[in-house]
């Protein structure tokens, strides 16, 4: 075990450990984003599935993995035999390889009719989601085991979001050019690009495993009365008001973000008639996200997490509204998208810092420390959001009359504009109301909670 500070709330983490933790979300987002960005288009344009079928695949698979996330959390909180690798790190190490194989397999076509292709694609995506849950939930849930310092948690969240943003940038900017290296065979080009990106994702996950340390792993004696089983774990979630509000917020914001990502490839090709623009837009907008991630820790120290979170949402809304009303050209689309993504950087970064703080809140309220279940309760809502966000674009593409590889009608173009701009705005406004009116955990309250928890331990 590494040396810890006498006061866990003041422990400072070394730079290389923060970097290693950020590499973890770089790797996991590469493995995730190639599917988020391109799998629906692969289903519709290469496999020949109707948009609704592609949406149903996402809906079923993501709802399934919402429950596998919860199962992963309960499994983590039920572990009693903790080896030298730690409580969470082994799953980062061992699950990353099958995740890589299945991320590639998702882009493999089958010689069946539409129904057979749909069934195989659904099963592959569900299996991918199962092992991804084991890897990614363990990665996210170990933050409370790394540090109890709220500033360091915010810093880890920034590094995590930086890694996630870089992963999204690489997938947005690089995937299509890599595909284009294989000419004349769309199926093979998808497999080639997916293989290359997935192998890099695997490498970064293993570097994360090697570079982070678990310092605060509490292993209680094996006692059925103390073991955090299903009922106790759900009690910890149900009585955790900040966690519940944060789950609602993520249901909205992640849904908005994922719909935007899924539709932008259609928007640039069929509305702006410039598919190459997606790479440039990704480059500049992700650069703005990096700026937001860099500024986030300082903004949090000055204004607090809640105010920065809501401020980011307001910037996001402004960017999307400007794009809808004034973003008819390529340059204006990129400029206003940069503004929206800059605002989203604060929101997406702070999600991970806020959910880590709710672990102590839940322990303070119920007496049960359930890092795994708190985190996966949070990701349950994120997966539900991803399920709906995966289904909704595919279903809406059918409703607005989208036909692949042809000039779209005026009604279809307007439908794409509303999907990529207005729909995210509405969800962002709902989130502003939820966080502004109902989220009650601030920095002063968190410090008091940690002190009371430590005092309880000394009196037992």
Curated annotation (Swiss-Prot):
Residue stretches spanning the membrane: 19-39, 47-67, 92-112, 123-143, 162-182, 191-211, 243-263, 276-296, 308-328, 330-350, 387-407, 419-439
GO molecular function per UniProt: symporter activity
GO terms, biological process: carbohydrate transport; sodium ion transport; transmembrane transport
Keyword presence, Membrane: yes
Compartments it resides in: Cell inner membrane
Entry coiled-coil feature ranges: none
PROSITE patterns: NA_GALACTOSIDE_SYMP
Signal peptide location: none
Periplasmic topological domain residue ranges: 40-46, 113-122, 183-190, 264-275, 329, 408-418
Domain of life of the organism encoding this protein: Bacteria
Main location: membrane
SUPFAM superfamilies: MFS general substrate transporter
Membrane topology, as annotated: Multi-pass membrane protein
GO cellular component: plasma membrane
Residue spans, topological domain Cytoplasmic: 1-18, 68-91, 144-161, 212-242, 297-307, 351-386, 440-460
InterPro entries referenced in this protein's UniProt entry, alphabetically: MFS_2, MFS_trans_sf, Na/Gal_symport, Na/Gal_symport_CS
Alphabetical keyword list: Cell inner membrane, Cell membrane, Membrane, Symport, Transmembrane, Transmembrane helix, Transport
UniProt family annotation: Belongs to the sodium:galactoside symporter (TC 2.A.2) family.
Function comment: Could be involved in the export of 2,3-dihydroxypropane-1-sulfonate (DHPS).
Name used for this protein in its record: Putative 2,3-dihydroxypropane-1-sulfonate exporter
């Amino acid at each position: 075990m590494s040396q810890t500070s006498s006061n866990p709330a003041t422990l400072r983490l070394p730079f290389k450990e923060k970097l290693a933790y950020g590499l973890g979300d770089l790797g996991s987002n590469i493995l995730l984003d190639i599917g988020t960005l391109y799998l629906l288009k692969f289903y519709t344009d290469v496999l020949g599935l109707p948009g609704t079928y592609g949406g149903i695949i996402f809906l079923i698979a993501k709802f399934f993995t919402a429950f596998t996330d919860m199962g992963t959390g309960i499994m983590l909180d039920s572990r009693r035999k903790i080896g030298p690798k730690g409580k969470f790190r082994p799953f980062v190490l061992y699950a990353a390889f099958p995740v890589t194989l299945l991320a590639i397999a998702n882009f493999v076509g089958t010689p069946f009719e539409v129904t057979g292709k749909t069934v195989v694609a659904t099963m592959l995506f569900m299996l991918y989601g199962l092992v991804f849950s084991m890897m990614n939930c363990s990665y996210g849930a170990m933050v409370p085991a790394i540090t109890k310092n709220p500033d360091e948690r915010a810093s880890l969240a920034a590094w995590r979001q930086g890694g996630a943003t870089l992963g999204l940038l690489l997938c947005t900017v690089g995937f299509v050019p890599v595909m284009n290296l294989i000419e004349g065979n769309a199926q093979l080009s998808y497999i080639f690009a997916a293989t290359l990106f997935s192998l890099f994702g695997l490498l970064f996950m293993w570097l994360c495993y090697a570079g982070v340390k678990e310092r605060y792993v509490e292993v209680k004696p094996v006692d059925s009365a103390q073991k955090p089983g299903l009922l106790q774990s759900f009690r910890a979630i149900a009585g955790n008001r900040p966690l519940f509000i944060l789950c609602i917020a993520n249901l909205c914001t992640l849904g908005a973000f994922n719909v935007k990502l899924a539709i932008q490839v259609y928007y640039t090709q069929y509305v702006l008639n410039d598919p190459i623009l997606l790479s440039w837009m990704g480059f500049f907008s992700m650069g703005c996200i990096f700026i937001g991630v860099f500024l986030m820790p300082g903004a949090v120290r000055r204004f607090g997490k809640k105010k920065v979170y809501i401020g980011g949402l307001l910037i996001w809304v402004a960017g999307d509204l400007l794009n809808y009303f004034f973003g008819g050209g390529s340059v204006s689309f990129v400029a206003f998208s940069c503004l929206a993504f800059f605002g989203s950087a604060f929101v997406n970064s702070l999600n991970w810092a806020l959910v880590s703080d709710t672990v102590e809140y839940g322990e303070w309220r119920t007496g049960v420390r359930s890092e795994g279940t708190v985190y996966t309760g949070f990701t349950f809502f994120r997966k539900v959001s991803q399920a709906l966000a995966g289904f909704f674009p595919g279903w809406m593409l059918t409703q607005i009359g989208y036909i692949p590889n042809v000039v779209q009608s005026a009604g279809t173009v307007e439908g794409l504009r509303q999907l990529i701009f207005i729909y995210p705005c509405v969800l962002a406004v709902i989130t502003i109301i939820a966080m502004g009116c109902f989220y009650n955990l601030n920095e002063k309250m968190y410090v008091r909670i940690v002190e009371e928890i430590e005092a309880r331990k000394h009196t037992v």
